[in-house]
Regions:
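Non-cytoplasmic
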Residues: 221, 229-233, 304-343, 350
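Cytoplasmic-entry segments and transmembrane alpha-helices of multi-pass inner-membrane transporters
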Residues: 39, 46, 100-113, 184-223, ...
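Interhelical loop and adjacent transmembrane-helix boundary motif
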Residues: 238, 323-374
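Membrane-interfacial helix termini and adjacent extracytoplasmic/periplasmic loops
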Residues: 131-164, 219-256, 328
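Periplasmic/extracellular loop-to-transmembrane helix junction in inner-membrane transport proteins
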Residues: 65-77, 90-113, 129-177, 197, ...
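Transmembrane alpha-helices
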Residues: 206, 210-211, 266, 271, ...
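C-terminal transmembrane helix and the adjacent membrane-cytosol boundary/short C-terminal tail
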Residues: 269-272, 276, 283, 310, ...
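Membrane-cytosol interface at the C-terminal ends of specific transmembrane alpha-helices
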Residues: 178-180, 186-192, 198, 202, ...
Length: 396
């Protein structure tokens, strides 16, 4: 039996159970819904949930564990489980049954299960990286990885896998991107929320948010074809700082443009959420519009603004395509923003692609790089949480 047929039959049984349960309990109460413990819809939902959810859960687990299993056996098992749930719940559907409590408990259990899936998925990702990183450090000294200044993987042996050049490129490009996106995005949000007319805001905000929907590969091509050559011809070559269109500045500027809608849109929503009474109180005490924004609105909106900046920073650190096309693939430590560099994410991709030995340290280093990115992102979250709590306490 095809899985689609099984799903349709299970859902049909649940729908039938919903209708039968409602009519049956209402008939048992003599047509008087006031004699029921719960509303009639709860009795129907109780039957539908206990009929469909266990069977659907069985199908999902079975297909995940045994994708090639016999579909007729799977369908029969799911239908038997659905029928058991249907008849069991019908048997206890009486006017005195606390259907609302049962349904709410069932839904609460589903929510807990979904939360556990998210938590266990995160834990699984972390433990998988830790496991593979452990294999890597058993083959390559951790001192040379964390403090090495040369990145030169050779699958034939003699590799130098120092992370510092990659970390420097990641932070350098991210810094330039944030230096572009944070001021522009934040000032745009302040203008749209505090100074712009509703008509202008309705036009400007969607136009800015269009940038968020552009694929990163398009930004990368924009960096490769337009921004890179322009920076090379008008800045790098005249100043004697380089002759390549691929550079840290190219990737940072284009990435900053990409991050503007993240900072702007989120900050705008947070600033608009500040109660109008705070603005009215500040204006009533004689503050100007700019003083109200600076001393009242922004401190109140600071937690959300920090969250927007954190989101932009995480996106910048994890970006790959713009760096590949805009900054090149050279792993070096240099202060010149017009030199080609690379980032951790680019090297993760390069080390895991191609016909490589998965047990070799040159491949396993990708997991160590990924774990490093995870730790950096976690550190950003901790710092942001500290800043939010500090300023929120001062404001309160």
């Amino acid at each position: 039996m095809p899985v689609s047929w099984t799903l349709l039959i299970v859902l049909a049984m649940a729908a039938a159970g919903f209708a039968i349960g409602r009519s049956r309990v209402l008939a048992a109460a003599g047509g008087d819904s006031r004699r029921l413990h719960s509303r009639t819809s709860y009795y129907g939902w109780n039957i539908a949930l206990f009929t469909a959810v266990p069977a659907l859960f069985l199908i999902a687990i079975w297909l995940f564990a045994q994708p090639q299993a016999n579909r007729w056996v799977l369908g029969a098992a799911a239908l038997v489980l659905a029928a058991m749930g249907l008849f069991w719940t019908l048997g206890r559907t009486t006017p005195q049954f606390r259907a609302r409590i049962a349904v709410e408990g069932f839904v609460r259990g589903l929510l807990i299960m979904c939360s556990m899936i998210a938590i266990l998925t995160t834990a699984g990702i972390v433990f998988s990286m830790l496991f593979e990183t452990g294999h890597f450090f058993r083959q390559y000294p951790w001192q040379e990885f964390f403090f090495g200044t040369t990145w030169s993987p050779r699958f034939g042996g003699g590799s130098q896998l120092g992370i510092l050049p990659l970390l420097w490129g990641t932070l350098y490009i991210s810094f330039i991107a944030l230096a572009v996106s944070i001021p522009i995005g934040l000032f745009a949000a302040i203008y749209m929320s505090e100074y712009a007319s509703p008509r202008l805001r309705g036009i400007a905000k969607p136009l800015i948010e269009v940038l968020a929907g552009i694929p990163t590969i398009v930004y990368g091509l924009f960096a490769l074809v337009t921004v890179g050559p322009a920076l090379r011809d008008y800045f790098a070559q005249p100043l004697g700082l380089g002759s390549s269109g691929s550079s840290v500045m190219t990737a940072g500027l284009v990435m900053g443009i990409m991050l503007i809608p993240f900072v702007s849109s989120l900050s705008d929503d947070i600033i608009n959420a500040v109660p109008q009474s705070l603005r009215d109180g500040a204006l009533g005490l004689g503050s100007t519009k700019s003083e109200t924004v600076r001393n009242v609105v922004l401190p109140a909106a600071l937690p959300g603004i920090v969250g927007a900046i954190l989101l932009a920073a995480s996106r910048a650190i994890g970006e790959t395509m713009i760096v590949v096309l805009g900054a090149g693939a050279a792993a070096r430590m240099d202060l010149n923003p017009f030199e080609a560099m690379t980032t951790i994410t680019v090297k993760i991709v390069s080390q895991l692609t191609g016909d490589t030995d998965f047990a070799a340290p040159e491949t396993l280093v990708a997991f160590a790089l990924g774990l490093t990115l995870f730790v950096i992102t976690l550190g950003l979250n901790v710092v942001a949480l500290y800043v939010v709590r500090k300023y929120r306490e001062q404001y309160e």
